[in-house]
C-alpha cells in the first residue's frame, strides 16, 4: 500500500499532534491537484484496537483481576530466624514470618521449621504453620480508624490482617496490632516452642479510648510495652496489667487548631517524605537499681505544629464529619517545631511502676543544634550508652549524625533555680557529639544504614555507615570518630557553635566503591557478623536492573562476593547466626519464589562460603495464559547516560501494522520502574493493554533512583523540565528499533509524579502525545509539602523560575484545543496530593477555554483502595484509550 508524503507541509502548530503525523496521511486521491509534488513511500497500515462496550471491558478487567487475586500478596515476608539448640531434634531453625495462607484473605503470623538435613535429590517445600488459632486480625467490616487508615496510606499497605509485629528474642514474645486492639503471644525463648496446635493470642486490655498505635516491646524488660494513644506515649506491663500515660502533650480536643502538640508520633511529612513511621525508641538497656528495681528509658520526639498550616478536605462521602482536617506544611511555609526528650520509668522488684519522669535536653534542641529542621532517624547504641539521631537542615544538603548521652537530659524544670539545680547534678563532661557530617550541593537521600559497634575505649566510637554524597554513589564505610569532650559550662546564656560538639574522624574506610549502589533506603538492612568481621548487604554491583545479596570484609575490605544467582532480582534476609539466608526473587518472565539457602564451606574462609539451596518456602506460580513478559532494552541518551526501558509488545502483532502506543510513566525521584523483576502482579494492567493490541513502553529517565546522585540529581531545581525529553528520546529509539510503534498514536499515562509528567508531556510535546491520562497530579509545586518539594526545588523564593516552569497549571495555554486529548483522575480525599491541585488545574483550563475530561473518586485518597474504584479506573482507562487514541 502506498501513502503520500507531502514535501510541503503547512506550518506546524504547537498544539497539534497532527503535524507530527502528517507523514502518515491517507493515500493520494486519484484526482489530487496535479500541481502538488508528491513522493511515494511504502508505509505500514495502522492496527486499530477492537472497541468493546463498557460491560465488555468490565469482563476483561474481571478476568485479569481474578488471576491477580490468586497471587497478589501471597509471598511470605518480614522474616525472623530463631535458632534451635536441641541437638537431638530434626530442625536447626524456626522461621517466623507474615504471610497469607492458602484460602485466606488476610495476613497472619506463621512459622516454618527448617530441617538440619535434606535430601538433595528432592525439592523440600516447607509447610506454612499457623501460630494463631482462629484469629481474625482485620477490624470488623474492614473499617479502620482514621489513624490506621492514614498510616496505611503512608506505608502504601494494601494487605489486611497483621501487617507488622515486634519480637523479643530472649523471651519469645510477639506483639502486634490487630482488630483495633493489641495482642501478644509467646513462642521460643525461655518457654520453648509450641509443638502442634496454634495458640490463642492474649489481648492487652486498656483504659484508653481510641486506637493504640505503634506498639513496641521494651528490650530491657519485655514485660513492658509502649504504644501511642491520641498522640501521646503510654506504657503498660503485660504481666500486671498496670498502664500509665507517660506524656501529656495532646489535649484530646476535636479542634485541631487548639491541639497542636504530640509526643512519640512521626508527622505527616516525616512519614511521607522521610520514611520514618515512629517517633519513639526504647533503650535496649535496663539499669538495675540497688534495691532490685529497674530504670527503663524511652527517647521520643515532641512536636509542636502550632505554626503549621491547616488544610480542610470537605467531602459528602465523609457524612458524619463534614470535613477532614490536617496539618500540612506547604513548601516555603513553617514546619513543626521539634525536640527530643526522654521518658524514664522506675520499677520495684516486682515490676510495679514506682515513678515515671519526663526529661528534656539541658538546653533547647534549637540552641544545641541550630539550623536543624528534621530528625530523620533516631535510636540507641546496642549497649544503651548513647541515644543517636540523624539531623537534617531545611535544604536537606547537610546531615549530622549525633550521639546524645542520657545524662544530657534533665528533669523538666518549672523555673530557673530548679533548672540550675538539675544542671549542677549533671555528671562532668556530658555533651552531645556530632560524630559524622555530610554536605552536598544536590540533596541528601536519607537512608536506614547505621551500625554502631560497642565502644572499646571511651574516647572513640566505630560504626558502619553509607554515604552517597562523597562519590555520587551510595557506598558502605567503616568510620571511627574521636569523642573529644569539651569543657562546657551549661547556662541559659550559653549559645554553642556547632564546632563545639563536632568530632574529628580518625579513620574512614570505604568497604565498597564503583558506579553502583548499596541499597540503603526504604527499610534496607545490613547484617554484621562481628565474629568473622563480615557485613552482608544488598546492592546493584552486577547491574542496575537487579538487586543481589553480597558480602565483604569490613576489617580488610577488598573482594565483594555475590551470594544470589544472577538473572533475577532478589530481596533477602540473613539469619541471626549468619548460616542461612532467605531470598524472595523473580525476573521479568518468572513469578516470585521464596527459597532458603544455607551457607556452607570452611569456617577458616567465611567470606567464600557457598550458598546451597536448602528448602523452598514458595514456588513460582504459573503465569496466566495470556501473560507475555516485557522486553528490557537500553539506549545511549543524548544526556550522556545509558537509559533503560521496558517494552510490552502487542500480543496480536501483525507484520507491517503500526500499533497504538502507551507510555507508562512515573519519572520522579526514589522510584525505579525498569528492573529484572516480575511485573505480572503490580503492573498487570500493562499486560492487559498489550493483550488488547497496544504497545506499552516504560522508561526510567534521569531523576529515577539507583543510578547515582548525578543521575537522580538532574532534576535539581527543575522538576518537569528534563524528564519528558528522556521519555521522548526513548520512544523514538523504540520506534526505530521496533517498527510496529505508531508515533502518531501515543498516549502518556501515570499516577502522582507520573500524572504530573503526563500533563507535562501534553503541554511541551503535544506533537508527540495524542492523549494524556493524568492520575492525582501535582499541578502547582507551591501547594505541595516542604520535605519533598524543597529537597528537589529549594524554597520558592530561591527558585521562582523553577517553580513556575514546573507548575503545569500555569501553562494550560499550551495544552491542545482538540477535545478528548486530556483525562484527569483524582481521589477527592487525597491527603497527599490534595484535590486542590486538580481543582486549580480545572479552573485554569476553564478560564483558558481548554477541553478536558475529569473522573473523580469521591471516597479515595492518593492510592485507590476500594476494589470497585480500582475496577472503575481500569475500565475508564481502557475505554478512553479505545475511543480516543
Curated annotation (Swiss-Prot):
GO cellular component terms given for this protein: nucleus
Taxonomy, superkingdom: Eukaryota
GO MF, any single term: aminopeptidase activity
Disulfide bonds: none
A Pfam family this chain is assigned to: Peptidase_S9
Annotated active site: 752 (charge relay system), 830 (charge relay system), 862 (charge relay system)
Catalytic activity, reaction form: Release of an N-terminal dipeptide, Xaa-Yaa-|-Zaa-, from a polypeptide, preferentially when Yaa is Pro, provided Zaa is neither Pro nor hydroxyproline
Compartments, record wording: Nucleus
UniProt keyword list: Aminopeptidase, Hydrolase, Nucleus, Protease, Serine protease
GO biological process: proteolysis; regulation of inflammatory response
Disruption phenotype: Knockout animals display a marked reduction in body size and a significantly shorter life span.
Enzyme class: hydrolase
Residues that bind Val-boroPro: 752
KW Membrane (keyword) present: no
SUPFAM superfamilies in the record: alpha/beta-Hydrolases, DPP6 N-terminal domain-like
Summary of the function given for this chain in its UniProt record: Dipeptidyl peptidase that cleaves off N-terminal dipeptides from proteins having a Pro or Ala residue at position 2. Acts as a key inhibitor of the NLRP1 inflammasome.
Record-stated family: Belongs to the peptidase S9B family. DPPIV subfamily.
Quaternary assembly: Homodimer. Forms a ternary complex with NLRP1, composed of a DPP9 homodimer, one full-length NLRP1 protein, and one cleaved C-terminus of NLRP1 (NACHT, LRR and PYD domains-containing protein 1, C-terminus).
Name of this protein: Dipeptidyl peptidase 9
Organism: Danio rerio (Zebrafish)
Amino acid at each position: 500500500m502506498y501513502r503520500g508524503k507531502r514535501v510541503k507541509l503547512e506550518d506546524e502548530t504547537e498544539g497539534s499532534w497532527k503535524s507530527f503525523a502528517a507523514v502518515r496521511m491517507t493515500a493520494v486521491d486519484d484526482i489530487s491537484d496535479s500541481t502538488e509534488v508528491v513522493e511515494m513511500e511504502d508505509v505500514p497500515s495502522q492496527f486499530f484496537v477492537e472497541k468493546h462496550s463498557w460491560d465488555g471491558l468490565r469482563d476483561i478487567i474481571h478476568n485479569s483481576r481474578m488471576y491477580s487475586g490468586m497471587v497478589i500478596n501471597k509471598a511470605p515476608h518480614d522474616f525472623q530466624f530463631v535458632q534451635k539448640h536441641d541437638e537431638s531434634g530434626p530442625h536447626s531453625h524456626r522461621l517466623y514470618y507474615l504471610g497469607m495462607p492458602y484460602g485466606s484473605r488476610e495476613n497472619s503470623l506463621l512459622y516454618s521449621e527448617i530441617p538440619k538435613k535434606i535430601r538433595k535429590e528432592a525439592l523440600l517445600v516447607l509447610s506454612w504453620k499457623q501460630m494463631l488459632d482462629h484469629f481474625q486480625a482485620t477490624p470488623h467490616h474492614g473499617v479502620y480508624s482514621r489513624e490506621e487508615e492514614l498510616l496505611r496510606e503512608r506505608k502504601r499497605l494494601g494487605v489486611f490482617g497483621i501487617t507488622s509485629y515486634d519480637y523479643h528474642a530472649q523471651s519469645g514474645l510477639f506483639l502486634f496490632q490487630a482488630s483495633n486492639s493489641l495482642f501478644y503471644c509467646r513462642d521460643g525463648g525461655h518457654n520453648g516452642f509450641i509443638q502442634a496446635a496454634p495458640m490463642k493470642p492474649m489481648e492487652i486490655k486498656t483504659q484508653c479510648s481510641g486506637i493504640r498505635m505503634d506498639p513496641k516491646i521494651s528490650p530491657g524488660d519485655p514485660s513492658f510495652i509502649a504504644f501511642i494513644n491520641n498522640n501521646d506515649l503510654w506504657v503498660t506491663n503485660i504481666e500486671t496489667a498496670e498502664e500509665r500515660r507517660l506524656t501529656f502533650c495532646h489535649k484530646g480536643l476535636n479542634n485541631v487548631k487548639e491541639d497542636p502538640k504530640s509526643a512519640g508520633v512521626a508527622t505527616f511529612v516525616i512519614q511521607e517524605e522521610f520514611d520514618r513511621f515512629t517517633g519513639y525508641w526504647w533503650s535496649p538497656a535496663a539499669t538495675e537499681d540497688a534495691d532490685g528495681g529497674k530504670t527503663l528509658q524511652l527517647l521520643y520526639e515532641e512536636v509542636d505544629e502550632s505554626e503549621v498550616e491547616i488544610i480542610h478536605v470537605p467531602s459528602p462521602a465523609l457524612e458524619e464529619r463534614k470535613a477532614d482536617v490536617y496539618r500540612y506544611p506547604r513548601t516555603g511555609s513553617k514546619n513543626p517545631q521539634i525536640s527530643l526528650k526522654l521518658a524514664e520509668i522506675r520499677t520495684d522488684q516486682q515490676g510495679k511502676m514506682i515513678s515515671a519522669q519526663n526529661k528534656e535536653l539541658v538546653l533547647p534542641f534549637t540552641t544545641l543544634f541550630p539550623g536543624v529542621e528534621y530528625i530523620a532517624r533516631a535510636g540507641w547504641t546496642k549497649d544503651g550508652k548513647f541515644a543517636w539521631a540523624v539531623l537534617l537542615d531545611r535544604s536537606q544538603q547537610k546531615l549530622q549524625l549525633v550521639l546524645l548521652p542520657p545524662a544530657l537530659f534533665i528533669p523538666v524544670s518549672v523555673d530557673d533555680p530548679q533548672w540550675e539545680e538539675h544542671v549542677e547534678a549533671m555528671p562532668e563532661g556530658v555533651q552531645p557529639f556530632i560524630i559524622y557530617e555530610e554536605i552536598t550541593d544536590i540533596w541528601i537521600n536519607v537512608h536506614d544504614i547505621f551500625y554502631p559497634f560497642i565502644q572499646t575505649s571511651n574516647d572513640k566510637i566505630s560504626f558502619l555507615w553509607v554515604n552517597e554524597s562523597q562519590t555520587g554513589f551510595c557506598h558502605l564505610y567503616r568510620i571511627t570518630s574521636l569523642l573529644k569532650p569539651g569543657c562546657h559550662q551549661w547556662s541559659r546564656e550559653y549559645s554553642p557553635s556547632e564546632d563545639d560538639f563536632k568530632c574529628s574522624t580518625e579513620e574512614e574506610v570505604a568497604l565498597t566503591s564503583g558506579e553502583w549502589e548499596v541499597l540503603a533506603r526504604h527499610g534496607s538492612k545490613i547484617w554484621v557478623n562481628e565474629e568473622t568481621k563480615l557485613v552482608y548487604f544488598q546492592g546493584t554491583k552486577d547491574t542496575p536492573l537487579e538487586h543481589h545479596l553480597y558480602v565483604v570484609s569490613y576489617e580488610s575490605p577488598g573482594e565483594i562476593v555475590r551470594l544470589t544467582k544472577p538473572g533475577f532480582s532478589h530481596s533477602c534476609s540473613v539469619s541471626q547466626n549468619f548460616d542461612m539466608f532467605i531470598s524472595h526473587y523473580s525476573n521479568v518472565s518468572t513469578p516470585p519464589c521464596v527459597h532458603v539457602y544455607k551457607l556452607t564451606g570452611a569456617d577458616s574462609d567465611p567470606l567464600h562460603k557457598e550458598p546451597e539451596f536448602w528448602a523452598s518456602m514458595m514456588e513460582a506460580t504459573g503465569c496466566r495464559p495470556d501473560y507475555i513478559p516485557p522486553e528490557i532494552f537500553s539506549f545511549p541518551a543524548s544526556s550522556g547516560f545509558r537509559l533503560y526501558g521496558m517494552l510490552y509488545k502487542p500480543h496480536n502483532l501483525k507484520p507491517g501494522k503500526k500499533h497504538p502506543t502507551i507510555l507508562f510513566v512515573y519519572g520522579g525521584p526514589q522510584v525505579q520502574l525498569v528492573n529484572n523483576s516480575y511485573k505480572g502482579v503490580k503492573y498487570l494492567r500493562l499486560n492487559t493493554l498489550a493483550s488488547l493490541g497496544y504497545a506499552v513502553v516504560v522508561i526510567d529517565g534521569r531523576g529515577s533512583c539507583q543510578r547515582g546522585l548525578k543521575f537522580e540529581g538532574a532534576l535539581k531545581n527543575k522538576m518537569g523540565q528534563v524528564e519528558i525529553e528522556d521519555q521522548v528520546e526513548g520512544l523514538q529509539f523504540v520506534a526505530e528499533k521496533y517498527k510496529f510503534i505508531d508515533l502518531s498514536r501515543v498516549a502518556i499515562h501515570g499516577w502522582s509524579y507520573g500524572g504530573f509528567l503526563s500533563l507535562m508531556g501534553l503541554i511541551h510535546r503535544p506533537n508527540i502525545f495524542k492523549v494524556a491520562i493524568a492520575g492525582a497530579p501535582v499541578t502547582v509545586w507551591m501547594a505541595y509539602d516542604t520535605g519533598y518539594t524543597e529537597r528537589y526545588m529549594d524554597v520558592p523564593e530561591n527558585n521562582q523560575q523553577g517553580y513556575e516552569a514546573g507548575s503545569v497549571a500555569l501553562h494550560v495555554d499550551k495544552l491542545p484545543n482538540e477535545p478528548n486529548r486530556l483525562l484527569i483522575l483524582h481521589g477527592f480525599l487525597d491527603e497527599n496530593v490534595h484535590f486542590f491541585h486538580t481543582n486549580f488545574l480545572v479552573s485554569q483550563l476553564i478560564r483558558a477555554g481548554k477541553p478536558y475530561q475529569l473522573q473523580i473518586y469521591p471516597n479515595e485518597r492518593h492510592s485507590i483502595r476500594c476494589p470497585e474504584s480500582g475496577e472503575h479506573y481500569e475500565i475508564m482507562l481502557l475505554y478512553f484509550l479505545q475511543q480516543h487514541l
